[in-house]
């Protein structure tokens, strides 16, 4: 009988960051006693939510309706991708390509300004502020491009979206104050949030602006330990909101997107999906890690450790219930199915070495050597299968693993993850999940390492059919 072991990504993050998070909780308690006048909410709006003049105006109304809170904004939809494209041109020394792309982006923003502002003075102010941002990018394009400047270019999207929103709110009589993320959001030498620095700097900014109606700040962007502009990686605006929420001991963290919360399956492929009303933090972390794009995986931990509910809401339908994530007790239910694409499965077969002392340790050391994370691992008496989601160092990894046995590689695989209350005494759920895929080839199954998921590795071409069958079996 084969044995299956699940490498719980959430637990891994928890262990690696615990020392910093313990410090962070202490800072949150200090802040609660010293300067936060009342518990605010942290509202994060993603790129699609502020993707046009019409949507910026709509989000502004939502901001005002929610009262005095901290609002975290992403860049307007498409902006970060365009800035990445500009960086690619600069790496290739294609200056004309970078200039043309930048000009097109500026034209887009000019159109947004013209549509958003009917007041000439506000329109001129917006044009001036955004003009400064585009002029700054042009100085980089015209100079000898350095690697450090890549992140400075990427930061401009959030700086522009918050500038537009700030001007728009003030035009409509709202005392909006910008909290520049580059003045308080910092990572340490390990790339982890610098808790003491964030708490201290953010406290000063809030104290200096006590009478504000609304606090606006940028998601995603930060400075590193050396004072250079950096970021929290794609999707990092959720993480920014969660870190801020923990610092101010927020009443609630709201993540606003263009969908009604976390669905029980992928609505792009499966009909009649429905929002999941509530999840506990562990379930949410599993779904976020294994493919639910609505929430960044790193967002969960700060909220969990500070017991702050996270609510997923729809900008286009604010009255929709959405999903609330909190420390809810186990309820014995399957909550949702998610899929993680672009997985590579690697099998090492070696009957002679597998059971030898230290064999698995050597396998793991290989992946550590190339800084490649493992999503799943399943072992049997004669082989071990691991999955990874990055093939950047695949050739080198495979060469090293050949020292331990025969290596086979399957690319274009998918991890299907069934999430819910899967405590061992809640019998039958895992059987229903596996039997639903009866005639779909399953490369590996992982169950037992987490109380909240059962994961199966299948071919990418079988993903949609697998999602539909699981939906029929588990939710009908």
Task: For each feature predicted by the language model, list its residue ranges.
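Serine residues within intrinsically disordered or low-complexity segments
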Residues: 2-4, 38
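Nucleotide/pyrophosphate-binding catalytic subdomain
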Residues: 26, 30-295, 300, 459
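A conserved active-site cap/scaffold subdomain adjacent to cofactor or substrate pockets
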Residues: 285-325, 332, 339-347
């Amino acid at each position: 009988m084969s044995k299956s072991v699940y490498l719980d990504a959430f637990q891994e993050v928890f262990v690696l960051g615990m020392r910093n998070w313990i410090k962070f909780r202490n800072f949150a308690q200090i802040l609660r006693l010293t300067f936060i006048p009342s518990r605010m909410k942290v509202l994060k709006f993603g790129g699609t939510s502020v993707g046009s003049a019409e949507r910026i105006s709509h989000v502004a109304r939502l901001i005002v309706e929610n009262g005095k809170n901290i609002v975290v904004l992403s860049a307007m939809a498409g902006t970060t991708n365009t800035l990445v494209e500009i960086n690619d041109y600069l790496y290739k020394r294609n200056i004309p390509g970078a200039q043309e792309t930048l000009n097109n982006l500026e034209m887009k923003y000019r159109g947004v300004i013209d549509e958003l502002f009917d007041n000439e003075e506000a329109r001129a102010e917006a044009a001036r502020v955004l003009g400064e941002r585009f002029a700054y990018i042009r100085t980089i394009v015209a100079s000898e491009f350095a690697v450090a400047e890549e992140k400075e270019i990427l930061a401009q999207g959030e700086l522009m979206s918050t500038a537009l929103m700030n001007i728009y709110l003030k035009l409509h009589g709202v005392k909006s104050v910008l909290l520049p993320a580059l003045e308080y959001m910092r990572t340490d030498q390990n790339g982890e949030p610098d808790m003491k620095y964030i708490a201290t700097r953010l406290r000063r900014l809030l104290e200096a602006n006590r009478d504000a109606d609304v606090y606006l700040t940028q998601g995603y962007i930060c400075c590193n330990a050396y004072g250079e502009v950096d970021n929290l990686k794609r999707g990092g605006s959720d993480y920014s909101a969660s870190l801020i929420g923990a610092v101010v001991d927020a009443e609630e963290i709201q993540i606003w997107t263009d969908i009604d919360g976390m669905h029980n399956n992928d609505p792009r492929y499966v009909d009649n999906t429905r929002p999941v009303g509530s999840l506990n933090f562990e379930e949410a972390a599993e779904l976020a890690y294994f493919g639910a794009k609505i929430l960044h995986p790193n967002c969960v931990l700060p909220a969990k450790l500070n017991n702050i509910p996270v609510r997923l809401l729809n900008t286009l339908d604010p009255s929709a219930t959405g999903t609330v994530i909190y420390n809810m007790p186990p309820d014995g239910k399957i909550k949702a199915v998610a899929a993680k694409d672009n997985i590579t499965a690697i099998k090492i077969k070696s009957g002679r070495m597998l059971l030898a002392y230290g064999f698995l340790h050597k396998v793991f050391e290989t992946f550590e050597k190339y800084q490649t994370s493992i999503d799943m691992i399943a072992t049997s008496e004669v082989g071990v299968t691991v999955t990874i989601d990055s093939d950047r160092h695949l050739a080198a990894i495979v060469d090293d693993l050949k020292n331990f046995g025969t290596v086979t590689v399957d690319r274009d695989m998918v991890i299907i993850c069934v999430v819910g209350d899967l405590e061992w005494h809640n019998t039958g759920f895992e059987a229903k999940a596996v039997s639903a895929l009866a005639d779909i080839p399953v490369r590996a199954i992982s169950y037992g390492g987490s109380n909240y998921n059962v994961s199966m590795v299948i071919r990418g071409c079988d993903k949609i059919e697998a999602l539909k069958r699981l939906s029929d079996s588990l939710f009908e």
